[in-house]
From Swiss-Prot:
Region (Necessary for nucleocapsid assembly and virus assembly): 1-33
Stretch list, region Transient transmembrane before p62-6K protein processing: 729-749
Lipid modification (S-palmitoyl cysteine), residues: C729, C749, C750
Protein name stated in the entry: Structural polyprotein
EC number(s) stated in the UniProt entry for this protein: 3.4.21.90
Segments of this protein annotated with the region E1 fusion peptide loop: 896-913
SUPFAM superfamilies listed in its UniProt record: E set domains (SSF81296), Trypsin-like serine proteases (SSF50494), Viral glycoprotein, central and dimerisation domains (SSF56983)
One cellular-component annotation, GO: virion membrane
Region (Host transcription inhibition): 33-68
Pfam family, one: Peptidase_S3
Amino acid sequence: MFPYQPMYPMQPMPFRNPFAAPRRPWFPRTDPFLAMQVQELARSMANLTFKQRRDVPPEGPPAKKKKKDTSQQGGRNQNGKKKNKLVKKKKKTGPPPQKTNGGKKKVNKKPGKRQRMVMKLESDKTFPIMLDGRINGYACVVGGKLFRPLHVEGKIDNDVLSSLKTKKASKYDLEYADVPQSMRADTFKYTHEKPQGYYSWHHGAVQYENGRFTVPKGVGAKGDSGRPILDNQGRVVAIVLGGVNEGSRTALSVVTWNEKGVTVKYTPENSEQWSLVTTMCLLANVTFPCSQPPICYDRKPAETLSMLSHNIDNPGYDELLEAVLKCPGRGKRSTEELFKEYKLTRPYMARCIRCAVGSCHSPIAIEAVRSEGHDGYVRLQTSSQYGLDPSGNLKGRTMRYDMHGTIEEIPLHQVSLHTSRPCHIIDGHGYFLLARCPAGDSITMEFKKESVTHSCSVPYEVKFNPVGRELYTHPPEHGAEQPCHVYAHDAQNRGAYVEMHLPGSEVDSTLLSTSGSSVHVTPPAGQSVLVECECGGTKISETINSAKQYSQCSKTAQCRAYRTQNDKWVYNSDKLPKAAGETLKGKLHVPFVLTEAKCTVPLAPEPIITFGFRSVSLKLHPKNPTFLTTRQLDGEPAYTHELITNPVVRNFSVTEKGWEFVWGNHPPQRYWSQETAPGNPHGLPHEVITHYYHRYPMSTILGLSICAAIVTTSIAASVWLFCKSRISCLTPYRLTPNARMPLCLAVLCCARTARAETTWESLDHLWNHNQQMFWSQLLIPLAALIVATRLLKCVCCVVPFLVVAGAVGAGAYEHATTMPNQVGIPYNTIVNRAGYAPLPISIVPTKVKLIPTVNLEYITCHYKTGMDSPAIKCCGTQECSPTYRPDEQCKVFSGVYPFMWGGAYCFCDTENTQISKAYVTKSEDCVTDHAQAYKAHTASVQAFLNITVGGHSTTAVVYVNGETPVNFNGVKLTAGPLSTAWSPFDKKIVQYAGEIYNYDFPEYGAGHAGAFGDIQARTISSSDVYANTNLVLQRPKAGAIHVPYTQAPSGYEQWKKDKPPSLKFTAPFGCEIYTNPIRAENCAVGSIPLAFDIPDALFTRVSETPTLSTAECTLNECVYSSDFGGIATVKYSASKSGKCAVHVPSGTATLKEAAVELAEQGSATIHFSTASIHPEFRLQICTSYVTCKGDCHPPKDHIVTHPQYHAQSFTAAVSKTAWTWLTSLLGGSAIIIIIGLVLATIVAMYVLTNQKHN
């Protein structure tokens, strides 16, 4: 490849010291014979150690032990080491090895670092269990005990361990026994610590995540049961019992240990035991191992197909199918030659509804088309075959087809496939073809050979299926990775099958000819032909292998020649007739099935976000139609789900509980509003009104309306009283001629006196004529002075309105409290115990899991309609056999006239009958693309807590059930039960594509056609399938062999189109929904009761802690409704330096610090969070209390990306300034009313006194 010789790295030259080396001290020389004995003993021990693993060599090339031994034996002497080095050097200088296998060099995979480490540790601690000379599983020695899987039969390959008497633990599928004392020093250690990450076992790395051990698919198989899984320190974390394939990975069934050292078994659904049990098959009432059949296909093809048919339901069918393709003595083919089983089949001709001109019998008839992947690929099933030559040998990029009984081939690049535009053919194997096609409403396949064009078209809507939340039409170059389903580009065995059977007889008129007055039949070479003739009154029916002449008949129309072949299978197509008698069925693997993968999805441009007061504005400009989903993070999610196709602006309200939006394939974004608003709660009246109007618009409007009504009422009442008093006062003087009104009365009633008098003269007149009015006049200033004094007192001495959210009581040795179930929000409290210093307790929940108990009812997927080849009886009647398959329909049609490519099938015209059968089964892609219907029951709650008690911190996993305690540092903690038995999951839930939906699905066995659950199976691999698809058979068209039918569309596909957003986007309280296992995390609902049992050792005597002699608290800065936006400075004088707990007994403020360091004199800074505008709280430091109070200002940011750390149930107080202005307003209104009342009283007294005097 390169024009220059490759350069290999040279060995570095040794460093030469320019100074002479010191002489080595002399030691007495050891006996060479004794050294050789020690070396031989060490070598023998190493061989004994590794001999236990010779039956199962590791992955990679076998070790060249023989060459090494011979070289050592040939040069074994006192200078043996030098000889070995010379031999190695000679090997390097020898000629390079010649390439074999057509120039392909086999790449040997060497064991990795993990495998080498496990092999080294397993060598003398893991022992194979032998059964019939084969390794059936393994036993390992862990912690002084021998563990072996209960399901593994056989004898341990160790004399000491095999003689031990074991005890059975069927619950854990284990047998165990105590190992002898002499072996306990060299055993595995075990651990319950299993942080998420990667561990090691015999085959490499094991991933541990969400409580599950998984390995890549194909790593590990039967025979690995009992192998240990080790951590980096060589400790056993689990023992493997089995596994189950889940897409691209295999989930392991293991036995492990929990924190208490109790054995726990975890088994995934549909898990298989990995003991190497030999599966037996049957041939003529004789059993044999499925992997060792007595016959093979190349030698006895017909008998082999019969054997496969009789074992079609055997669990070892795949082993038998693989074994019959390899006859003993034949060389093994390359591992790249996959799916050799299709040499058991042959192509066929079938009717195509739309050829170049009308319908025809086409060699490339299209049977089925599927395009369910997310990569734009289409999988076709045709009557032609791919990857095989006419003789049945593997030949890549080749198509073979049946042309009137003759199998021909054509290069695959000469075959065209197109929809609206040409397709790109990826590969083909067997009856299946994989291609990438543009969108279109039909698909056409054609090729041309010898100036003849063969084509076939079928109606099928081909379109690109995007994955994710953006409806793109072409895969992007860059973006995010998401799980998806794609068609595998190889032909590996992935558990999907297609049904085969022996073909029926095919009429071939080309085999008939006339010679004189007789009919001549010429069978093809190596084939048998069934001849049926009706010549006059003579009926002939026989099978011939060579040419034969029938003189009884003179016309070819009197005879039918049927091709018969019992050594090849064909697809069980409705376009082919069924063979007479018992049909030998089989099944072969389907290539190019759907698999799980990672697809690149586009990311829509990020929205332009504008924050407002309790609102968010999103300016969206998508490139593709993109979904926008929003929800509130409280009990009422009020979610929205909208497909945005054009640039738009959407406005949403945000509350203190939180709001979340998901834009396309971007991760969710959450926002919380803060209690911010324009204006100033401590400013002038208009600023106060503006502030409260934005925060509480309805309450502010109502309050202002009430104040305005009070002021208006007071003014109106005062005016009315004044007018009434004036009229009552002036009326007597108006009726008296030349009456003179006193001066004081004229002033009160706003009337002009008859003559001008001084104040003294007026008082003298009242004293002489009306003393009651005199004293009333003197009381008016006194009343005004009293009112002014009381008003001033009310204005200056207003008590602010504070709401106390609650107090946290402190117990003693046994402490109980309640913590809000909100992740990330710290909860601080203290324990006050007589004679001891307060003990601070801080708890921060990092994760809270709600795991429901679920029961899988069934799985549903896209169904596949299976149609048996129609059974045609010429000139006779038939009856349907009993039906036993899902939704199977059977119907007999009379008066059919079938016709094949070789001519008419029957002699009769109207007496022929046809049995049509159709049924429903799971699609080949059901293993990957399916939905699971669960019933959910009581949920368990698991909390991950960061706990600090005093100076001791730990991380604990607590089951919130009120029963299961957790011990750490002597502290015993019991949590739960949760204050509310709430769950986001309904009684019926559906899991699809890693997401959970609340859906009321029909019960098992009660599905409806065209709805979810129209096809049901207990598990993916179970055979008990129920279906209801409204399958109705129709009468076949005359002149064609086919099975027409009508059927309801797939309810599963319709549900996928109509399904609402999953719980991931709609769950209340901000729950995060996950699968494997199904769970909800971090739901901010309810509270968690906690009970602490604290030992005496964690308490500190009061005498050993500092005490404060003086303390003064000042609020330096305070921003309410913000995360620790308050800063308090406490100046103190302490008895000595030390550490003290700080706490606020009330819920007015939440402290960031749980303890502070104190000096003998100084100040401490404490951060707090509050929702109060004018906070006033008592701060406990050690055993002393100090009061902190001040004014808080609103936060500057309207929206933040994190929740508030204070109690959200706390309602903010009305500021002191607002109360001052409010009381002033009400006080002014009261003065007006009081003045009116005083005037009315004075006038009334005067009128009454005057009338009495007169």
